[in-house]
């Protein structure tokens, strides 16, 4: 008995109630005879969290209606032919960088706070509160994404496929979020850096260090989104793979055409019994006619497929190029901010080097003055020895000794200063 694939994704009320009663946060009962103070780990709850049901918001492509559903990972894998590694990108228990993956029947998007699976008929947006970025912020981002997607589905006037509209809204949400963070970081950074150039303090240096850490993390995220868009733009096969509506239409047309040819074959086979034909000339003629019709049909399909693929690739490429310009502008702002921080660091290092040079010059002057003073110490030490010196009996000998020693010390000090300036140890 066949079931609607949408019904397989929705949980029955009893299953949802059982999942809520036996959720991953339920504490396991202690074993009999064991101590009552220990806390047991609910291994089955962890297994259910890793591979169980997730809360999603489903947006229908035809009507734009949204509803909250709980979808099991195995059901998604079976219905959309997605490998487990693709769904792992959307798992809130793991931290993965931004990624856009085009598959046979779906497009998997992990763009900042928007994690969704887009098909030709619907979009499933993950609204789990454990998603990185905070439960309330993620819930608000999902709500805005759904509202914007519904608005564009209602107001759309062009023939843009649903998957491109959903992808465009996701790219716009990610680019706007990253650009807002970049603007906020710029508003905090430039005044702080200007203040640091005039007043170097430990507090300002610590604030700049934290700001630079935020800048590096944000630049890495923006660079990843930019690389994903650029990688898609450089690969025509990946862009053609993301044209889900066209692939679905071709598949339906191929099935109808196959059924029509099977019906024609059956009717032709039935009529061959009622009318006598020549046993020699008829089968080769019918086979030749069949080959010509098949060849003409295949050529027509190939030409139509090539034209449609080229159109879809150009359409998607223009869409991606628009947001590539936006994210590249955000990256250029962050790069300019990083260069400004580097220039400020260089300026501070120059200032510190200048202060260090001044301290070295002062130390050199102090050392030279100490050497000159040491000359007085030598003279006083010589005259302080306990032996007879005839100079002690000469009138005014003490005054002349002080004058001559001072003049000699001053001359030696001036010679040192002249030498330092000649060797450019001191500024002229």
Swiss-Prot record:
One annotated Gene Ontology cellular component of this protein: membrane
GO molecular function: magnesium ion transmembrane transporter activity
Annotated transmembrane regions: 364-384, 400-420
Motif stretch (Required for magnesium transport activity): 384-386
Signal sequence region: none
Major location (coarse): membrane
Cysteine pairings via disulfide bonds: none
Membrane topology recorded in Swiss-Prot or TrEMBL: Multi-pass membrane protein
Localization, UniProt: Membrane
Key words, A-Z: Ion transport, Magnesium, Membrane, Transmembrane, Transmembrane helix, Transport
Annotated CDD domains: Mrs2_Mfm1p-like (cd12823)
A GO biological-process term: magnesium ion transport
Keyword DNA damage: no
UniProt-listed InterPro entries: CorA_TM1_TM2 (IPR045863), MRS2-like (IPR039204)
Disulfide bond keyword on record: no
Function of the protein: Magnesium transporter that may mediate the influx of magnesium.
Family: Belongs to the CorA metal ion transporter (MIT) (TC 1.A.35.5) family.
Annotated protein name in UniProt: Magnesium transporter MRS2-C
Species this protein is from: Oryza sativa subsp. japonica
